[in-house]
Amino acid sequence: MIVYISTAAFLYYTIWVLIMPFVDNMNISQKLFLDREWAITIPVAVMLFGICLIGTFVSLLMIKSSKKKSDL
């Protein structure tokens, strides 16, 4: 299931970024995609959120590890 969602998201984004800039603005297929500014904003926001999650996870592991060492 997740493979299909990932593939669909990849294809949508690829078409949106690589093909749609060359399609005429009056074409009906332009209505299927968001504005071009979102093509950069969405991936950057997802990447920042992922970096924050990874940083939080690593920080919690380091805090847990230091508590175990201090208890010994």
Curated annotation (Swiss-Prot):
Pfam families membership: DPM2
Record keyword Transmembrane helix present: yes
Transmembrane regions: 2-22, 38-58
GO biological process, one term: dolichol phosphate mannose biosynthetic process
Subcellular location: Endoplasmic reticulum membrane
Membrane topology, record value: Multi-pass membrane protein
Function: Regulates the biosynthesis of dolichol phosphate-mannose. Essential for the ER localization and stable expression of dpm1.
Name listed for the protein in its UniProt record: Dolichol phosphate-mannose biosynthesis regulatory protein
